[in-house]
Amino acid sequence: ELNSKKLIDDAVFCFAIGEDNEAKEILLNVINHEPRNVDALRAISEVCLSLQELKLAESFCRRALTVDPDDLTSVVSLARILVKNGDKEGAEEASSKARILGWKEELASDSE
């Protein structure tokens, strides 16, 4: 049985200390076993962005958003990736969605 939480934590640690390729390898392993793991998809998107693999970063980020369209972190990541890709219009659209999701989260936490 794959301990995806531990593996993702290991990958995040590798990423934090600059071992991007090691982090990517770990995350690909998790995604091969759990293709809809939003945490792994979100993390590998950031790793690919760091490696300047923009198309791959965008692809993994969009996969995370397919699983959870309202994932604020993924929407913000997508905006950053699109900016780096030179897609100003797409980045503005993603940024706008991120603001709306942020407000929704804020309102939800205020009403608790």
Where does each model-flagged region fall?
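Structural signature of tandem alpha-helical TPR/SEL1-like repeats
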Residues: A16-I26, L51-R63, N85-K97
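Short acidic DE-rich linear segments
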Residues: E105-E112
